[in-house]
Each structure stands twice: as structure tokens, then as C-alpha cells.
């Protein structure tokens, strides 16, 4: 018996009046994930398009793969590089991850396999916990509301896992995604009704609730007892000269062979996925362009002003682009169609606001050397107001033409 025949055979148990009626959302989620939904439009459609919500979300999910696979390799590479330089640290490692890695691979930074297995041992448990715990909340709320479970959580789960440091405790991952899904999305009605990005909401919760595991120099490398600063932290301490003197070139930062959150280090891998999203019109090119313009404008202004006490005033825009979470946030977070502005003019304003805010937070606020998360969440809060003024201005303009 094939999968399709099996699903058809048990379907009546999950329909209204069936033995497992309350679990219909779970059955429907599995059915629509594996196969195209059987529902069709019976009357004339107002809009005809070749892409639906399922295809859109799966496309976004697939577009994260370049950043995800590179992130796993880089997580392992950074750890194995430290082991090669400090054998005493390798001898001091212990725990289930270390035992698992030792059973399937070695610790050679020049080995693609060793690096990938090392990184996978950290990323895959984070992703699994995110998917299981977040999926539980999605199914629970869908069952209570008698709604379907849509594919939006595929995107939320992978985005959240990719913006975390590899060393984060798994119980904090579960707590963070629970907050993001329940408080950031479900209490507002679920997919399509949230005004904050759920993945960023989850990360913000962890950032403020457990700062020791989300920031600092000890969380970015999967090696117990080692502390390594990110390029942005080095820039904050001594400017671009400090970054370069530490051995990090602009190309290193662009390719992604640096410390950082699992999926945020490689601007190149992120742009590969972003090109597909923009080309398929899933991501708004207006928002992406607006973010770049806002960032370039303010960073250039700070370069011209200069500062003797703040070295980040001198950071050029092309360095802002490749360090921290700027590229990942611009491509995958700012373009979220639910929490971003919906009007064309509003998308420009929304994007520019993010670009300006991220540089402002990075350069002027000494408490947060990284500002992309807060910049996007702030813009999410402003998005309804931006659209309101754009729509009102359009109404006034059209009325004026008819006077």
C-alpha cells in the first residue's frame, strides 16, 4: 500500500465525527506536506497564480540551505582550527557531542567531512529541538482553533536555528522557540496575523533573558574553554584596523570563515539564497534595496563625521554588510511579508528605516555591537503606521485630482 492510499484510508478517522477528530490538524499537515492539497476553486478565481502558500514557504526553506550547510561546515571548521592550534583543549573536551563526533569523524580542519560532522553535531540538535517544540505549539493551537497547520513553521524553525550560537543549551532553544511561536505569533491569531517576526521575537527573548549564552566571546566557537571574538566585536574594540590585524580580511567575512551565529557568517551563501527569493518575487527587492541604501547612507555619514573615541564611526558600509547578522536579516527577516510593510512606498520606508537603525545601534549604542535584530523588530512595530500614512497620502492625492 502506497503512502497516498494509506492516507486516504485513514482520513475518515480524522474528519468531523471520527475517532481522532481533534488531531485533524496533524493529519492535514502531513497530507499537504507530502502531496498537493485536493481542494480546488469552484467559482471564478479573482487571482490566479502558480505559487501558493505551501510552495512559497518551501521555497524560502530551501533558500536557507546554502547558509545552513555552509554554517554547519564553518562551525566545525572554527572548532577544529582551535583544536589544531591548541591540542590541550582537544584533550579536555567531553560530553555526548564530543563522543558522537569522535565516533564518526576526526578533528582535522582541512577535512571537509570532519568539519561538517562537527558542525552537524551542534546544528542538528538545535534544529530538531526547535522543530519538535515549535511544531508541538503549532499543532496544539491549530487543533484548538480547528485550523490547518501551514508550512510557515518550516521557515520559522530553520531561521531561528540559524541565528543562534552553536553552544546554546538545548533547553534554552526550547524555551526561546516556545516564546516566539506562542507570544510572537499564536496569541495574535497565528500565521498571517502576527506583527512581529516570530524567529526574531524568540531570539530577542533569549538575548535579554539569557545574555551569557547569547553574547560575549565564549559562545561563538563550539569548543569548551575557548573564547573568540566576532569580527563586529573586534571592530567595536579597535575599528577595522583591529579586525584586519587579527587576521580577518573582507573576503574572509564575505565568504564566512569567521566566528558568529551558525547561519549568519557567510554573506555569499546568504546572497545565493536571496537571489532566488528576489528572482521568484517572494522577497521584496524594494525592502532589500531600502535596507542597503539606509545602511550605506548613515555609515557613510558617520565615516565623514569621524570620532576619536568611537572606532566604529570609521567602519565602511561594505564591512557593515559582511559582519554580524546584517546580510541574513536583510534577506530572510526584513522581507517577511507578514511583519513588513505591505505598500510599495511603505516597503522603501520600511527598508531604509532598518538600514539606518542597524548602523545607529551598532555605532552609537555601546551596549549592542550588533543591531540587526533590534532594528528589524523596531521596524516591525512601525510597519502598520508606515502603511497607514502611505495609504492616507494616496487617498488625499487621489481626492485632490478630482476636486
Swiss-Prot record:
It catalyses: a ubiquinone + n Na(+)(in) + NADH + H(+) = a ubiquinol + n Na(+)(out) + NAD(+). The modification FMN phosphoryl threonine is found at residue 230. The chain crosses the membrane at residues 56-76, 121-141, 163-183, 220-240, 258-278, 287-307, 312-332, 348-368, 371-391. Signal peptide: none annotated. GO terms for cellular component: plasma membrane. GO terms for molecular function: FMN binding; oxidoreductase activity, acting on NAD(P)H, quinone or similar compound as acceptor. Its main location: membrane. It is an enzyme of class 7 (translocase). InterPro entries: NqrB, NqrB/RnfD. Its EC number is 7.2.1.1. It is found in: Cell inner membrane. It is a multi-pass membrane protein. Keywords: Cell inner membrane, Cell membrane, Flavoprotein, FMN, Ion transport, Membrane, NAD, Phosphoprotein, Sodium, Sodium transport, Translocase, Transmembrane, Transmembrane helix, Transport, Ubiquinone. GO terms for biological process: respiratory electron transport chain; sodium ion transport; transmembrane transport. Disulfide bonds: none annotated. Its cofactor is FMN. Belongs to the NqrB/RnfD family. NQR complex catalyzes the reduction of ubiquinone-1 to ubiquinol by two successive reactions, coupled with the transport of Na(+) ions from the cytoplasm to the periplasm. NqrA to NqrE are probably involved in the second step, the conversion of ubisemiquinone to ubiquinol. Composed of six subunits; NqrA, NqrB, NqrC, NqrD, NqrE and NqrF. This is Na(+)-translocating NADH-quinone reductase subunit B. It comes from Stutzerimonas stutzeri (strain A1501). The gene is nqrB.
Amino acid at each position: 500500500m502506497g503512502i497516498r492510499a494509506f492516507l486516504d484510508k485513514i482520513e475518515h478517522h480524522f474528519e468531523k465525527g471520527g475517532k481522532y477528530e481533534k488531531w485533524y490538524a496533524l493529519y492535514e499537515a502531513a497530507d499537504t506536506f507530502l502531496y498537493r492539497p485536493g481542494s480546488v476553486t469552484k467559482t471564478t478565481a479573482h487571482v490566479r497564480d502558480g505559487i501558493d502558500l505551501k510552495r512559497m514557504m518551501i521555497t524560502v526553506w530551501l533558500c536557507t540551505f546554502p547558509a545552513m550547510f555552509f554554517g554547519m561546515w564553518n562551525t566545525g571548521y572554527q572548532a577544529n582550527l582551535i583544536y589544531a592550534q591548541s591540542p590541550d583543549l582537544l584533550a579536555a573536551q567531553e560530553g555526548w557531542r564530543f563522543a558522537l563526533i569522535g565516533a564518526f569523524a576526526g578533528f582535522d580542519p582541512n577535512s571537509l567531512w570532519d568539519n561538517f560532522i562537527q558542525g552537524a553535531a551542534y546544528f542538528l540538535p538545535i534544529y530538531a529541538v526547535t522543530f519538535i517544540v515549535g511544531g508541538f505549539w503549532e499543532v496544539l493551537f491549530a487543533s484548538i482553533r480547528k485550523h490547518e497547520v501551514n508550512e510557515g513553521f518550516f521557515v520559522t524553525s530553520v531561521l531561528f536555528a540559524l541565528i543562534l550560537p552553536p553552544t546554546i543549551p538545548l533547553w534554552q532553544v526550547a524555551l526561546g522557540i516556545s516564546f516566539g511561536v506562542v507570544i510572537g505569533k499564536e496569541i495574535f491569531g497565528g500565521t498571517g496575523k502576527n506583527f512581529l517576526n516570530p524567529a526574531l521575537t524568540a531570539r530577542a527573548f533569549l538575548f535579554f533573558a539569557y545574555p551569557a549564552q547569547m553574547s560575549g566571546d565564549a559562545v561563538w566557537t563550539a569548543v569548551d574553554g575557548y573564547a573568540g571574538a566576532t569580527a563586529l566585536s573586534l571592530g567595536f574594540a579597535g575599528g577595522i584596523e583591529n579586525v584586519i590585524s587579527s587576521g580577518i580580511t573582507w573576503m574572509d567575512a564575505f565568504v564566512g570563515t569567521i566566528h558568529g551565529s551558525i547561519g549568519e557568517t557567510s554573506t555569499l551563501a546568504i546572497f545565493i539564497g536571496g537571489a532566488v527569493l528576489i528572482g521568484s518575487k517572494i522577497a521584496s527587492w524594494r525592502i532589500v534595496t531600502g535596507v542597503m541604501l539606509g545602511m550605506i547612507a548613515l555609515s557613510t555619514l558617520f565615516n565623514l563625521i569621524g570620532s576619536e573615541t568611537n572606532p566604529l564611526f570609521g567602519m565602511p558600509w561594505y564591512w557593515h554588510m559582511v559582519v554580524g547578522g546584517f546580510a541574513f536579516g536583510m534577506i530572510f527577516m526584513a522581507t517577511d511579508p507578514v511583519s513588513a510593510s505591505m505598500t510599495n512606498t511603505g516597503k522603501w520606508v520600511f527598508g531604509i528605516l532598518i538600514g539606518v537603525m542597524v548602523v545607529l545601534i551598532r555605532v552609537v549604542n555601546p551596549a549592542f555591537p550588533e543591531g540587526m535584530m533590534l532594528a528589524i523588530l523596531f521596524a516591525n512595530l512601525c510597519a502598520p503606521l508606515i502603511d497607514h500614512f502611505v495609504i492616507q497620502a494616496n487617498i488625499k492625492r487621489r481626492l485632490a485630482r478630482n476636486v
